[in-house]
């Protein structure tokens, strides 16, 4: 620790003070010479420095931390390859609208364009996948620019920011009186909007008189903490609700308005469809699966998302919670018209749900070995409690789980988001368990996905962060294998997608965790319980049928 006096302060310590002011409790990092003064400042400010084995993990963990807590996520990486390694994590957060700050090191300003160690144009690389990307040009401005970055993280639809800080800017000391450390409350104005009042009234009228309404609650319902408002609207207006992304868990399983498997049926027959906080992207068939006769309403934080890929009848730009609360208030006291007929509509959708379940039932209860993925995810769903945060990291296996696993509470479902990045599982476990040590964390990995960031299982052991991990092991990148088989035939289905028969349970044991192998479906439940009771990071290696493909995989248009 340098002998700073109260009269001077280094750039790294200014950064740490700014992070502390923003509510940052920990940073995720892989060490590098360019950034060590930030570590020193974090120690002084009481900010935990969590060191991982790959910068992609650091960025994903910052993303995961923001998703779980709603607080700022922060990763700090060194220059050059340290920053490029973090690009995937930042890009994933960008597509998922997750607020994080990535701080990257850089060579000294005095050596700019001279070929200094690990010198790269980081800002140019980060600009397309961040809301804000800049270089800190002067030590005295370090904290001020941290505040700029966080301001952009939270303005409108949230997202990541990037700051590049040269080594000499971090190491230099300046008079403390010249170094401003902004308070968030002193510079950040609220941009939350309840939407246009006329549009809110129109939506309320549509929902009051609709005979067959349906609503989709997307990730912004969780990120804006709109759960209470969403539940109140759905129950007050008696509307069937579907959930995707981080919106899963808004309504608990068993709620009469909670639906999961009949979305396509509902959207093809509804007269009013409300899409909240999710885009018309590939997960929504780009909006083409919605009935052409339905009145379609879209609510989103980002005006650029509203009406993108599909024409809508009404668009509302605003905070999901404020908008939905305003709609409920506008509709209260005049629940008539179509509302009286909704029991028939709800019963119709419940029957469609039951039909879908019965179609899957033989696989959900299958005793076959290798184990059918439906049986595996059914066992996982039965294992979850109200305190279980579920994380899905994979392709085909997670597509199976999306049809079966039902989180019991809001904020208890985590997946990569629309970028579909494999490898988020271990870093999301790290973030979730550190953010919510009172929660159980259960993670399902495809064997391909686990391979990308699996070495940071050691980080979980080192930080004593127990979780229940399951690897659905088919020794293949099976989602891609299906596509190759469908397009090019069985003779070429194994090109570039075959993995070894790896015993991930032994890998966990080698690193100090708990591991167990499962080949019989009857052993899944007991193995999960033993993993829970072990009190260690765990991996249950479950051998699943490589010739079973999720319906969502087989329906992907890229394979047709």
Where are these regions (language model features)?
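Active-site diphosphate/adenylate-binding microenvironment
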Residues: 15, 30-33, 38-40, 350-427, ...
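Thiamine diphosphate
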Residues: 103, 111-118, 264-267, 307-309, ...
């Amino acid at each position: 620790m340098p002998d700073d006096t109260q009269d001077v302060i280094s750039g790294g310590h200014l950064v740490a003070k700014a992070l502390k002011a923003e509510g940052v409790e920990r940073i995720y990092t892989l060490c590098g010479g360019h950034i060590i003064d930030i570590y020193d400042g974090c120690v002084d400010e009481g900010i935990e420095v969590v060191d991982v084995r790959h910068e992609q993990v650091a960025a994903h963990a910052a993303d995961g931390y923001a998703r779980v807590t709603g607080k700022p996520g922060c990763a700090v990486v060194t220059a050059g390859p340290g920053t490029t390694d973090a690009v995937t994590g930042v890009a994933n957060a960008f597509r998922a609208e997750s607020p994080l700050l990535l701080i990257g090191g850089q060579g000294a300003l005095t050596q700019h364009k001279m070929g200094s160690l690990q010198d790269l144009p980081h800002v140019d690389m980060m600009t397309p996948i961040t809301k804000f990307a800049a270089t800190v040009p002067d030590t005295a401005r370090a904290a001020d620019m941290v505040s700029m970055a966080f301001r952009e993280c939270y303005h409108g639809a949230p997202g990541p920011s990037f700051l590049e800080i040269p080594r000499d800017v971090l190491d230099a000391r300046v008079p403390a009186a010249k170094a401003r450390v902004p308070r968030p409350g002193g510079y950040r104005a609220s941009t939350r909007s309840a939407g246009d009042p006329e549009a809110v009234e129109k939506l309320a009228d549509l929902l009051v008189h609709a005979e067959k309404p349906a609503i989709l609650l997307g990730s912004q319902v969780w990120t804006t903490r709109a759960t209470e408002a969403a539940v109140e609207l759905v129950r007050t207006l008696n509307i069937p609700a579907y959930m995707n992304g981080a919106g899963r868990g808004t309504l608990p399983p068993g709620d009469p308005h909670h639906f999961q498997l009949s979305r396509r049926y509902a959207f093809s027959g509804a007269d009013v469809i409300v899409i909240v906080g999710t885009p018309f992207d590939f997960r929504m068939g780009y909006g083409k699966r919605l009935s052409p006769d339905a009145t379609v309403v879209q609510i989103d934080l980002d005006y650029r998302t509203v009406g993108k890929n599909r024409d809508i009848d009404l668009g509302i730009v605003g905070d999901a919670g404020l908008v939905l609360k305003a709609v409920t208030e506008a509709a209260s006291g005049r629940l008539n018209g179509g509302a009286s007929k909704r029991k028939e509509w709800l019963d119709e959708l419940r029957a469609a749900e039951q039909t879908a379940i019965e179609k899957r039932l033989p696989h959900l209860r299958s005793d076959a070995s290798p184990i059918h993925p439906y049986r595996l995810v059914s066992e996982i769903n039965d294992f979850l409690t109200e305190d279980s945060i579920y994380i899905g990291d994979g392709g085909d296996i997670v597509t199976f789980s999306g049809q079966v696993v039902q989180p019991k509470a809001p904020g208890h479902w985590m997946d990569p988001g629309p970028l579909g990045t494999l490898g988020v599982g271990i870093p999301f476990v790290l973030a979730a368990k550190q953010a919510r040590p009172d929660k159980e964390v259960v993670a399902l990995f495809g064997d391909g996905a686990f391979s990308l960031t699996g070495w940071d299982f050691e980080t979980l052991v080192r930080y004593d962060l127990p979780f229940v991990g399951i690897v659905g092991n088919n020794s293949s990148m099976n989602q891609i294998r299906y596509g190759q088989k469908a397009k090019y035939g069985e003779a070429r289905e194994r090109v570039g997608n075959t993995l070894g028969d790896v015993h991930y349970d032994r890998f966990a044991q080698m690193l100090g965790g708990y591991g167990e192998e499962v080949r019989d479906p009857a052993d899944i439940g007991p193995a999960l319980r033993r993993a829970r009771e072990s009190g260690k990071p765990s991996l249950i290696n479950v051998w699943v049928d490589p010739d079973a493909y999720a319906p969502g995989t087989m329906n992907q248009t890229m394979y047709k």
